[in-house]
Amino acid sequence: MNETIETQMLDALELFHYAHRFRQHQFVLVLDDGARLEQLMLDIRVLYSSHIKIVILYRADQSIGDCLDRWGQRGFRFHHLASQSPEQALEVLDRDRDWEEVAVIGLDLSSDQEAEALTRQSLQIAKALGAAKVFFLGEQKGLSLGDRFLSHPRPDELEGYLNQGTPLNMVPSRLWIMIAEARRSGIEIVILEAKSGTLFEEIFTHRGSGTLLTEDYPNEIRLGREGDLTDLLMLIRHEMQQGSILPISEESIAANIQNYFVYTVNAAIVASATLVDYGDSAELAKFCTLPRYQGKGRARQLAIQMIERAAELKKDYVFALSVNPKMWDFFLGLGFEETSREELSQSWQAQYDFSRPSRAFKKSVANGKVAC
């Protein structure tokens, strides 16, 4: 099969996978200062075509009428309600939830602190609608601490920054409102730049785009199961494209899925790795973590679970290989020692491409030695 066509089909599979996951979910889009609806229209049309329910909220003094008229003439209909109080907006939305158009509501906010009022009222409306996600679209890519971008900060982490007076690129009072509502209602809040493609990347790809604020979801490590196949394929595929891990077919993943260890956050797979049996030893392989969830110790927890499992299986040692210098430090930090690839299992050597510039690491687990 032509590789380009296969890549296109996998891209389509990823899109349909996420579209199916969010089908009939309610999303609320909030236009902050600097957000232009025109720049978001292609994203909104993709969401609408994916049968995601959309409500767009904006301050009534923002001018978006020309954009709505232009797209209405092109056949994309909006249900537009200008200059509504939050109470009126809720009444209309609650009464007419079955309309097929995208609802666009201008909120009349009689407050000196309009940014805070827009944040608070938008979240209250989203909660009343049972929305799954609220997207605040503005001039910033997301939250940042100096040059450090915060893709998925924990609520307690953000509270620490705010209590210490650490400068972030958002008015603290708005951020406090968001943290409180995420914890209280469980709504996922996304802070995102209002430009074409950002909503699509945030919703329909593994990468994400902005900053995601959530409550402290339950985390779990478990073994893979058949229903995980597409999630694992999407997760592993991008690491293969970058050359970080060796290619593996969907059939191979399916055949060995019970040997995959997956890390879930609120039941969604965010990281994975697999334990491959080689008789007296086992390989820790295929480490993958969604970009938003990297750097938070999840891969380490997966590795520890696999090392413990290898010890339970009475293996003499575990080993791992990587071409990535960050992974070299990762394995050394787990108590592995660098070794020659020729010192590893003969059955592993028989199927390995030694032209690959990988480095090998080994750790004894004989007699139950699993300390990391």
Where are the predicted features?
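C-terminal catalytic "cap/lid" subdomain
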Residues: 1-247, 251-252, 295
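Acidic/histidine-enriched, glycine/proline-rich intrinsically disordered or flexible terminal extensions
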Residues: 354-372
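A conserved beta-strand-loop-helix scaffold within acyl/acetyltransferase catalytic domains
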Residues: 243-291
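Conserved acetyl-CoA-binding loop-helix of GNAT-fold acetyltransferases
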Residues: 289, 295-310
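Conserved GNAT acetyl-CoA-binding A-motif
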Residues: 310-323
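Conserved catalytic-core motifs of GNAT/GCN5-like acyltransferases
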Residues: 319-321, 332, 337-356, 360
